[in-house]
Amino acid sequence: EAGEDCDCGSPANPCCDAATCKLLPGAQCGEGLCCDQCSFMKKGTICRRARGDDLDDYCNGISAGCPRNPLHA
């Protein structure tokens, strides 16, 4: 939601302060296909495997989301 860095609905998230919905100091992310142990996964890590004649999607190293491969048809 607006103003929140992470989902504070789960107090078990080790990257998020459940009271403030803000990332803990040193954490880059709290969730997402390209977030691993509170850090962005390195650029080029596959975050979504291809299905059919689709292409793999890769982490970009600067966000927790899994951006769509720009070469998709």
UniProtKB/Swiss-Prot annotation:
Cell attachment site (motif): residue ranges: 51-53
Domain Disintegrin stretches: 1-73
Location, primary (coarse class): secreted
Keyword Disulfide bond: yes
Disulfide bonds: 6-21, 8-16, 15-38, 29-35, 34-59, 47-66
Gene Ontology molecular function terms on file: toxin activity
Protein's cellular compartments: Secreted
Any single GO CC term annotated in Swiss-Prot or TrEMBL for this entry: extracellular region
Keywords per UniProt: Cell adhesion impairing toxin, Disulfide bond, Hemostasis impairing toxin, Platelet aggregation inhibiting toxin, Secreted, Toxin
Entry comment describing in which tissues the protein is expressed: Expressed by the venom gland.
Domain of life: Eukaryota
Functional description taken from the UniProt entry: Inhibits fibrinogen interaction with platelets. Acts by binding to alpha-IIb/beta-3 (ITGA2B/ITGB3) on the platelet surface and inhibits aggregation induced by ADP, thrombin, platelet-activating factor and collagen.
Known partners and oligomeric status: Monomer (disintegrin).
PANTHER family recorded: ADAM A DISINTEGRIN AND METALLOPROTEASE DOMAIN, ADAM METALLOPROTEASE
Note: The disintegrin belongs to the medium disintegrin subfamily.
Similarity comment: Belongs to the venom metalloproteinase (M12B) family. P-II subfamily. P-IIa sub-subfamily.
Record's protein name: Disintegrin trigramin-gamma
Provenance organism: Craspedocephalus gramineus
